Amino acid sequence: DYKDYMNEQVKKNIPESEKVRVILGGKERMDTIKNGTTAITNDNGIHDDDVIVIHDAVRPFVTEKILNDSIDCAAEYGACVCGLPCADTILHSKGGEYVEDIPVRSELYSGQAPDSFRLAHFIQMQDNLTEEQKKVITGTSQICTMNNQPIHLIEGDAINFKITTDSDLLIVRTLLGGK
């Protein structure tokens, strides 16, 4: 069973592993997040100053600065996402054949994880989503935009890149000295 295997790995590799729980994911991204928030609240309750940090395993090079800034930002503003100004021109195309629009690059940012939120408010926003909205979410911070709630932006870091392609894996191997 995958959960048993993960629990064994946690105990074997993480100091103070009693503070770590493995929570099974769900069919959709939002199901996984709901499983996590439910486990947190069942174990600990919810306090007004609690902050939840949601991060993707496909971004293993997140920095301590990003994590600390994200937590501080969410504590102050309620919701936080990190990102970088887009370096490339973005082309908007509905079918991939013709360019419909070219947005103003100076107004665009490439979103990264983590996303951080005051937990109680996040759970309320999560519970307000329709089933249709839950299916189209590509980033946790969209929960805020779908609830017409502001989300504060902090500066990310290029090293906090997402590993999704073969070329990303090549970069990782290079960073790790060819391993």
What spans do the regions from the language model cover?
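Conserved N-terminal catalytic core of the sugar/cofactor nucleotidyltransferase
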Residues: 1-49, 129-132
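Substrate/cofactor-recognition hotspot
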Residues: 56
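Hydrophobic helical membrane-anchoring modules
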Residues: 160-179
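Hydrophobic packing residues within well-ordered alpha-helices of enzyme cores
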Residues: 6-10, 70, 172
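Conserved core of the sugar-phosphate nucleotidyltransferase
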Residues: 61-154
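Residue-level signal for alpha-helix termini/capping positions
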Residues: 41, 45, 72-75, 177
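Structural signal for short hydrophobic segments within the conserved structured cores
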Residues: 18-21, 109, 152, 161-162
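Short aromatic/hydrophobic "clamp" motif used to bind/position activated sugar donors
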Residues: 52-53
